[in-house]
Amino acid sequence: MGQTQSANENVQVFGERTKLIDETKKFYKNFNKLEQFYLKENFTALGKNVNGKVVWTEDTFCTFFGIPDVFRLSEFLFHSACRIGGCQNYGGIDYIGMVRFIAAYTGRYKNVWKDDECLWKIVYSWTIPNAPLRSSGSSLTSSLASSFNLVKLGKTNATRQPTIPCSVLISLFTLLLCIGDFQSGDVFADHISMLISSSVQEKRSYAMSLLRGVYPDPLAKSMSLKSVFLFLQSNSYALRRLGYLFEIIMYQRNQHPHRLVEQRSSGLLMDRYSLRPQLEMFIPPEVFSDCKFVHLFNSEQHGYSMSSLEKCSSSFSGNTLLLIRALPLDASHADRRARQFLQKIPPKNKSLSGMLMQDVIKDSSRELVFGAYITGQWKESASSGFGDQSTYLFNLRPYHQIFRATRVSNEYCFFDKHFGIAFGLENSKKKTVSLLRKDGVILYVDNMLDFGFFRHTSRGVYSMGRNFDDICYEEFFEIQEVELLGMKPLRKE
């Protein structure tokens, strides 16, 4: 009986390995000839014979990819590569595993895996299972398929999910933000020099906004696989930067002209507060590579005036990016106008179901950054709005979330000099304060560009944040700076 079971397991493992090889052959076709050459050349040159199999050991992998020690990610990425490559019990990563690892992180899995399937495999490779996994390729493959199908059906049990340590996620997010500063044409040595500079600490503080975007629990030591997957699913371009880094190293190129876009001049607020790397996680890459940012309006340059904003925005017909930097506002504020604003829009009370964000994040001195990606031309009107289903709201700090249009409405933005700027309101011929008392995902800026508020209580014109369905978030704020950037397509030569 035992021999029969063992034989069946061997057949299963052999079948899984055969499938792995067949998949890898398809991945390999997605690499061009030069990339195939460098991949094979580098692997052969550094491979070592371990138990009769040529592999890259952990030391070889970490030395070759050379992620600076300040991130403490080399060992983590090696184990991720082994799990994606199906090499957990080889004492290293073999050539098939290396091809699969590079393909997964650089987008060369197309026509073999779907995007969500690949993302799930990557995130799964980061986890620390609550229960020990058998190391055979078959059991890992079965676990992957089973867990992925359960998530798609919404049947996962949070207590049984594998988890990812928050410390690892912070380091990973910090690395992604640092890579976001790379410029086309820089040599790799300059990249590494930048990565180990003092800017890493600044990026680490911003990485906390990303971690809070996965789930805003400051006491959490780890995040569930599903939470991280859903966060990265909504920030679908986040991992591309990590793939770019692997490409630069593996293929010995100083630049990837079709991958790393040149950092052209962007908005003042975007530059000064390092917002671009976060924006590039969810705004399509072609927006940055095929468009030039045009400075339409900045409150510090043009004044805190709705008339100035209208004048600066009305003549631009393309898509725009609105950025708002602010500080929290509460009832103890000394300014009379601030108190009047708070009285005009009463806060929602705690009878609302769900967790209140204020119970999670209590630092009143924290910086707030809100914004919107707006498709179509701005128009000033008391009765009609603008934008389409490609418009979305976002919050970059103190937590990172995107709120996409739900197609409930065909008017997503309202701009009225007498009322203010509003996103997420019900369609109405007349805009009044009563509309702001409704539930939903709403961003409002008053007609003096002084104060505003953001509310996250239910699905409406915009969807709720991923993993935030049970959280009621309401923030009143005092505006520090407003910026509007136009996106002007570059001429094709």
From Swiss-Prot:
SMART domains: TLDc. It holds the Pfam family TLD. Disulfide bonds: none annotated. One of its GO terms (cellular component) is cytoplasm. InterPro entries: TLDc_dom. Transmembrane segments: none annotated. Residues 268-488 form the TLDc domain. PROSITE patterns: TLDC. The keyword Membrane does not apply. It is found in: Cytoplasm. Keywords: Cytoplasm. Belongs to the RTC5 family. May be involved in a process influencing telomere capping. This is Restriction of telomere capping protein 5. It comes from Schizosaccharomyces japonicus (strain yFS275 / FY16936) (Fission yeast).
